[in-house]
Amino acid sequence: SISDGTSNTLMMSEVIAQENVSGGWQGPISETTHSVGGQGINGWYPPNSKNFDEVSRMCPPTAALNGIPGCTLIADIFQQTFVSRSKHSGGVSSSMCDGSIRFITNNIDPTAWRSISSSQGGEVY
């Protein structure tokens, strides 16, 4: 068994980004990305899950001027689900907190995926 540590804690993982539908530069990060409490994905659904992302996009006051479609203003940003996805066959490339890179398969046990997505949880896997 392996317990929590930097080599067993997920720091980041791949996400397939949507094309910029306005055809130009995406703009400053505050206008193009959505962050959920400092994270871009959560560990609830395994990699490449068929579950839909549930992300409400936060928009700056200039959204209409910059041609940013689909913006909604939301009060609660803490109940979002943003799944790690890739075009690799069978899984996603992920970086662990020790700097190592691992290929995590789509078949990872959901409990194990959730465990590596947290730090200091005391999980053993």
Indicate residue ranges for each PLM-predicted region.
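Hydrophobic alpha-helical interface faces used for helix-helix packing
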Residues: S1-Y125
